[in-house]
């Protein structure tokens, strides 16, 4: 063998079998940035049709987690695939930099503003802290192979962006959507600030559930509403009963609310302490059961509408409250009578406005009753629940009390229960200028993926309250408005003033607002106007980036955002704040497509939790397995639902990666010595199987590009794996090894094969590039340096487009796709019999076998098209076809109807060079150890191959 070894075309490549990604990827990253890969992409795509994926900014606090990695990798895959599809797809990453979490971190270091440091110093410390957090997260994202404007990201705290956020506020005010109101808002007593809807999360909480009596102020007038018969009016005090789980709100009660069409019943409670109570008829039995009242009877009925404006005594204060009517009253639970405190609930506030009720708010920003609150001054509201219950008992107003577990709003940061609290706030009004209706209409023009996203955001927009955009914080973009000290009206020149402020902020940052002397801007008006000192909700900051970033950054060339891509929780967050602000400013949605992904869970479907110990950190994965494994995991998941990750799941991704890598390595190793400029075989002269393989690559490419276009990365990876493992690995690459290794070096048989391998790897490397970016770059650098045209290969795979050199077989060809599909089935059936023969020691390897295939006429005609090259497809030393009628006794049935196969151990000698057993081994003078085919390949013109 040694004398012929040098005549074999053995594979050779500098592309290693082991990826060793954790070590190699940082070296590749270094080269990407040294050679300005992102800049090269931008240059290559300049002037192409644009595709803008606008980055939802992560919060600049803490290390990135696996959810961040999922999100950013998905964005990167989509942008790279769009680039390969010929789009100019810039990516400007962003960060959300203002807000409470950063304030809290800075407070730990320097204390609260106004104590050890001034507010100005505090803001500067916040800016420094956020900048450091951005840098840390930036490096983590870059390590994942994500390409973008990392040197010029957008940060909501950049002076220019802060100025544009202020301008956005001005436009919303100009368009009539800004509202100043004294309204109940979600209030976190730990934050000391209002919260947006998106900052509220619901968790179970145990609260006191109480049924409370409100005595009738005028019994006779009330009883007259029930049309009772003379002498059947009952006995004892008359009360209407409310149910609540927030006893602490009772000091602010200003009404009891009924529904106009509900029937209410006057019940006589019997026994030693008779009384008469009023509840909704539907709920009467529930109320009686709950209160443990067994003996009672009904005295009469009245509609809610009949009881409107009847007066009742407050249970512990010396004033009366009216019965009012509201549509929000239901019979799902409670008594059908709703305790109404306009200062502590949005529905209460809304119905209170109709009846001109006082909006009482006896609670301070820290959750403590104000000093003038009768009975409860100085107590924290949640601790005061017990005191309120005791007071109700003392006053004889408590009908029933028990502990009740229910879903309750909590602060997303502190994880503590929040309250509704009426305060003066700034709102983006949903209805005063038709914003809600316009938003709902615009939603229909957006493509929501998955489709359920549309109904989800529609429901949220339909039901949402006014957007409270003001915060009582230090580190945030100011609500840069001047209001009249007496009327609270905006200054008549607000538009011009906002632009002047924005110009100063553009130069000096938000601190400029607090530094500006009102007289500088207002002149003589300064005496009548005061600055608003509230800051903007951070959801406003990020929500207006469609204007502050997309409209303003030169990278986007004035194009609108095509896509927003975030987690499904952003229907109530960024998707919604962006939509509302864009409609308020421009009258249209800020995006054309909205794509959402689910949350990351562990292999058992549980949320990531340090206490459970199931947290998978991106850094740990890249340090151990490499970023390409993490990227392949992201691409392989159906990300529209929950996305599972665990060591076992990542191991499966690593296994899949190895199969793809090994396929690519086979291609590269067998292109050794191939020069596309001089060695390409014309299509019409290629061996039939080689043309089929290129056709399979074309079919795969069509499906893969379609899947990329539909953002279906899961389908991309499935098709890629099928192509590498099944179409190539299990069939084509297996069949061509003999020809590639043993054919005449540089002869037609070998060059045809290499031509196919070259075309396929040109396509394969591009399919991989959006997902396995590092490995694709590594492959690219091992591919032939020159192209068929003689031009040099581009420096990077990412600057090009999908390979356009593939071609398919015509269906009219004799050896078309259907033919090769049938041959794969025949080969599969034969392989089962060869495996059995190996198991029973009839043969060693398949090249020790000779086959006779007994086939029916139709199948035999197809198989015979391969002529004497059938044995190469079946990987045996000999294979002949005979009619089924001549079937031998030794022939075995296969799982193909009309096909029997006889497997025999060959008696021919083994060729030292190709290992085939053929009768001519030892018959050729001077080459006694090799077969005639090998002699031709070593000393002659080389074997001719037409089919395989």
Curated annotation (Swiss-Prot):
Q: What is its EC number?
A: 6.1.1.5
User: Which sites bind L-isoleucyl-5'-AMP?
Assistant: 566
Location in the cell reads:
Cytoplasm
Domain of life of the native organism = Bacteria
Question: Where does motif 'KMSKS' region map?
Answer: 607-611
Q: Which cofactor does it need?
A: Zn(2+)
Q: Which reaction does it catalyse?
A: tRNA(Ile) + L-isoleucine + ATP = L-isoleucyl-tRNA(Ile) + AMP + diphosphate
Q: Which positions does UniProt annotate for ATP binding?
A: 610
Keywords for this protein: Aminoacyl-tRNA synthetase, ATP-binding, Cytoplasm, Ligase, Metal-binding, Nucleotide-binding, Protein biosynthesis, Zinc
This protein's GO cellular component annotations are:
cytosol
Task: Give an example GO biological process.
Answer: isoleucyl-tRNA aminoacylation
Q: Which GO MF terms does the UniProt record name?
A: aminoacyl-tRNA deacylase activity; ATP binding; isoleucine-tRNA ligase activity; tRNA binding; zinc ion binding
Cofactor stoichiometry and binding remark: Binds 1 zinc ion per subunit.
Q: What is known of its domains?
A: IleRS has two distinct active sites: one for aminoacylation and one for editing. The misactivated valine is translocated from the active site to the editing site, which sterically excludes the correctly activated isoleucine. The single editing site contains two valyl binding pockets, one specific for each substrate (Val-AMP or Val-tRNA(Ile)).
Quaternary structure, from the entry: Monomer.
The record's annotation in HAMAP family points to:
Ile_tRNA_synth_type1
Q: Which PANTHER family match?
A: ISOLEUCINE--TRNA LIGASE, MITOCHONDRIAL (PTHR42765:SF1), SOLEUCYL-TRNA SYNTHETASE (PTHR42765)
Checking NCBIfam families in the record gives: ileS
Q: Which family does it belong to?
A: Belongs to the class-I aminoacyl-tRNA synthetase family. IleS type 1 subfamily.
Protein function? Catalyzes the attachment of isoleucine to tRNA(Ile). As IleRS can inadvertently accommodate and process structurally similar amino acids such as valine, to avoid such errors it has two additional distinct tRNA(Ile)-dependent editing activities. One activity is designated as 'pretransfer' editing and involves the hydrolysis of activated Val-AMP. The other activity is designated 'posttransfer' editing and involves deacylation of mischarged Val-tRNA(Ile).
Protein name per the record: Isoleucine--tRNA ligase
């Amino acid at each position: 063998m040694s004398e012929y070894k040098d005549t074999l075309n053995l594979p050779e490549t500098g592309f290693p079998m082991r990826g060793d990604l954790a070590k190699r990827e940082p070296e590749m990253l270094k080269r990407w940035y040294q050679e300005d890969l992102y800049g090269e992409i931008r240059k290559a795509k300049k002037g192409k049709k644009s595709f803008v994926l606008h980055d939802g900014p992560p919060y600049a606090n803490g290390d990135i987690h696996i959810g961040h990695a999922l999100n950013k990798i998905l964005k990167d895959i989509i942008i790279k695939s769009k680039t390969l599809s010929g789009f100019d797809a810039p990516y400007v990453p962003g960060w959300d930099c203002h807000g409470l979490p950063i304030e809290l971190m800075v407070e730990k270091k320097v204390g609260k503003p106004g104590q050890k440091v001034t507010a100005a110093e505090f803001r500067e410390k916040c800016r420094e802290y956020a900048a450091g957090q951005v840098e840390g997260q930036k490096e983590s994202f870059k390590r994942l192979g994500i390409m973008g404007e990392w040197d010029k990201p957008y940060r909501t705290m950049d002076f220019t962006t802060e100025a544009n956020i202020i301008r956005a506020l001005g436009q919303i005010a100009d368009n009539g959507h800004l509202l100043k109101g004294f309204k109940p808002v979600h209030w976190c007593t730990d934050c000391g600030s209002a919260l947006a809807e998106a900052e509220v999360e619901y968790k179970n909480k145990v609260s006191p559930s109480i049924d409370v009596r409100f005595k009738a102020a005028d019994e006779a007038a009330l009883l007259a509403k029930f049309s009772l018969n003379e002498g059947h009016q009952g006995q004892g005090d008359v009360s209407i009963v409310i149910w609540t789980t927030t006893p602490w709100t009772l000091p602010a009660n200003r009404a009891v609310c009924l529904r106009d069409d509900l029937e209410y019943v006057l019940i006589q409670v019997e026994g030693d302490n008779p009384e008469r109570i009023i509840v909704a008829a539907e709920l009467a039995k529930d109320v009686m059961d709950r209160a443990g009242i067994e003996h009672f009877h009904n005295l009469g009925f009245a509609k809610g509408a009949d009881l409107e404006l009847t007066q009742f005594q407050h249970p512990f204060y010396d004033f009366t409250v009216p019965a009012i009517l509201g549509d929000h009253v239901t019979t799902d639970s409670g008594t059908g009578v709703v305790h109404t405190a306009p200062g502590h609930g949005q529905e209460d506030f809304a119905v209170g406005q109709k009846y001109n009720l006082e909006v009482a708010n006896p609670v301070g920003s820290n959750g403590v009753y104000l000093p003038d609150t009768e009975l409860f001054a100085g107590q924290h509201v949640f601790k005061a629940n017990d005191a309120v219950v005791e007071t109700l008992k003392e006053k004889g107003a408590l009908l029933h009390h028990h502990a009740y577990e229910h879903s309750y709003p909590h602060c997303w940061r502190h994880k503590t229960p929040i309250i509704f609290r009426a305060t003066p706030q700034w709102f983006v009004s949903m209805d005063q200028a038709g914003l809600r209706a316009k938003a709902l209409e615009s939603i229909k023009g957006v493509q929501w993926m998955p489709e359920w996203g549309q109904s989800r955001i529609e429901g949220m927009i339909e039901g949402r309250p006014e957007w409270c955009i003001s915060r009582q914080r230090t580190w945030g973009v100011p609500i840069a408005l001047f209001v009249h000290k007496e009327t609270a009206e905006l200054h008549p020149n607000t538009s011009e003033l906002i632009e002047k402020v924005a110009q100063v902020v553009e130069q000096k940052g938000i601190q400029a607002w607090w530094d500006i002397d009102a007289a500088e801007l207002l002149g003589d008006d300064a005496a009548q106007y005061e600055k608003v000192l509230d800051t903007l909700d951070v959801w406003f900051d990020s929500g207006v980036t469609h204007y502050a970033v997309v409209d303003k950054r030169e990278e986007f060339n004035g194009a609108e955002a095509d896509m927003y891509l975030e987690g499904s929780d952003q229907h109530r967050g960024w998707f919604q704040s962006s939509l509302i602000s864009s409609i308020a400013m421009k009258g249209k949605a800020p995006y054309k497509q909205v794509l959402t992904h689910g949350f990351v869970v562990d292999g058992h479907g549980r949320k990531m939790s340090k206490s459970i110990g199931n947290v998978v950190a991106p850094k740990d994965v890249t340090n151990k397995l490499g970023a390409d494994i993490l990227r392949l995991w992201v691409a392989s998941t159906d990300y529209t639902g929950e996305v599972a990750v665990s060591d076992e799941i990542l191991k499966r991704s690593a296994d899949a990666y190895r199969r793809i890598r090994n396929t690519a390595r086979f291609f590269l190793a067998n292109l050794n010595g191939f020069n596309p400029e001089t060695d390409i075989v014309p299509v019409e002269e290629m061996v039939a199987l080689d043309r089929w393989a290129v056709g399979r690559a074309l079919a795969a490419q069509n499906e893969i590009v379609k899947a990329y276009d539909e953002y279906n990365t899961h389908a991309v990876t499935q098709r890629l794996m099928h192509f590498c493992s099944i179409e190539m690995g299990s069939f084509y690459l297996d069949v061509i090894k003999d020809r590639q290794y043993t054919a005449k070096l540089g002869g037609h048989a070998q060059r045809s094969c290499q031509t196919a391998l070259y075309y396929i790897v040109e396509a394969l490397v591009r399919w991989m590039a959006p997902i396995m970016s590092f490995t694709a770059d590594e492959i690219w650098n091992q591919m032939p340096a020159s192209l068929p045209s003689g031009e040099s290969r581009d420096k990077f795979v990412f600057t090009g487009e999908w390979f356009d050199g593939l071609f398919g077989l015509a269906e009219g060809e004799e050896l078309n796709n259907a033919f090769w599909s049938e041959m794969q089935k025949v080969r599969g059936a034969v392989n089962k019999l060869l495996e059995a023969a190996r198991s029973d020691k009839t043969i060693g390897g398949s090249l020790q076998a000779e086959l006779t295939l007994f086939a029916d006429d139709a199948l035999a005609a197809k198989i015979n098209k391969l002529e004497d090259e059938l044995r190469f497809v079946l990987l045996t030393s000999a294979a002949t076809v005979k009619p089924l009628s001549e079937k031998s006794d030794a022939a075995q049935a296969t799982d193909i109807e009309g096909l029997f196969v006889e497997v025999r151990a060959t008696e021919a000698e083994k060729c030292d060079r190709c290992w085939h057993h053929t009768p001519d081994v030892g018959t050729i003078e001077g080459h006694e150890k090799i077969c005639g085919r090998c002699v031709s390949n070593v000393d002659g013109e080389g074997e001719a191959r037409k089919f395989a």
